[in-house]
Design a protein with these regions (language model features):
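Short acidic, glycine/serine/threonine-rich loops at helix termini
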Residues: 22-26, 67-69, 97-100, 141-143, ...
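Catalytic/regulatory signature loops of cyclic-dinucleotide turnover enzymes
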Residues: 2-20
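A structured phosphate/pyrophosphate-recognition subdomain
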Residues: 5, 38-62, 71-82, 161-221
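Residues in the short beta-alpha loop(s) of Rossmann-like NAD(P)-binding domains
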Residues: 17, 90-92, 157
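C-di-GMP signaling machinery
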Residues: 16-51
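Active-site cofactor/cluster-binding pocket
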Residues: 112-166
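Anionic-ligand anchoring segments at beta-strand to alpha-helix junctions in alpha/beta enzyme folds, i.e.
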Residues: 51-122
């Protein structure tokens, strides 16, 4: 399962607690199908409707892919009529410019909350969506990730042995260029008529641009 989650072109050997990987060095080519994205989107949509509130969290020191994907999901969830917030604790240089654009629009006044505010909002029906990370050591706030029972992981990095446990959905797609690309695809299946604003689209595009190194890496169709 771990080998398949990392792309399938490798062997995994576990010796006691030590895990070694052999292979997995081939160039990652497009192997995804839209069927899986459609199924995941439908499952995600149902979980959102079953939730009292939704929190979104990325990795430590979030970059444009993590934050752009978060904003895209936030927009889709709000269009489904549910309460949603993105957990951000500190000002991050990598996303300062985009963050300031969001802050200049009153639509996004309640977009962000701190970890301490998020902990107060947690209840049995809270759903946590973890984006652009699945490793316990890199998630923004492991305490929150472990405290919330209902959680989903959306990520494009090769699967780590130290994965956050207990997720209702693990959507880890190593052939995607970025988490922002994955979220963009999910949105079109989550909503009948998506209404993504210019600034939200810029965030998703910025995430894809960053992780493809200016559309030079993993940008084939």
């Amino acid at each position: 399962e771990l080998a398949l989650g990392r792309g399938g072109d490798q062997v995994v050997i576990k010796n006691n607690e030590k895990i070694s990987f052999f292979g997995g060095n081939t160039r990652e080519l497009e192997k995804r199908t839209r069927v899986r994205a459609r199924v995941i989107a439908q499952a995600l949509r149902e979980l959102i409707f079953e939730s009292s509130n939704i929190l979104i969290m990325g990795h430590k020191n979030p970059d444009m892919d993590a934050f752009g994907a978060s904003v895209g999901l936030w927009s889709a969830i709000r269009q489904l009529g549910k309460s949603c917030n993105i957990i951000i604790d500190n000002d991050i240089n990598a996303i300062d410019y985009y963050m300031n654009k969001l802050k200049s629009d009153s639509k996004y006044d309640n977009l962000l909350i701190s970890s301490s505010e998020a902990e107060k909002a947690i209840n049995d029906k809270t759903l946590l969506i973890i984006v652009d990370v699945h490793n316990k050591g890199y998630v923004s706030n492991l305490n929150i990730a472990e405290k919330i029972n209902r959680k989903i992981i959306i990520d494009h990095h090769r699967r780590s042995p130290d994965i956050i446990e207990g997720a209702l959905l693990n959507y880890i797609e190593v052939y995607a260029s970025s988490t922002s690309e994955m979220v963009t695809e999910l949105i079109q299946y989550m909503l009948q008529k998506p209404r993504i604003s210019k600034i939200e689209a810029e965030g998703l595009l910025g995430g894809i641009f960053m992780d493809t190194k200016g559309f030079q890496f993993k940008s084939g169709v």
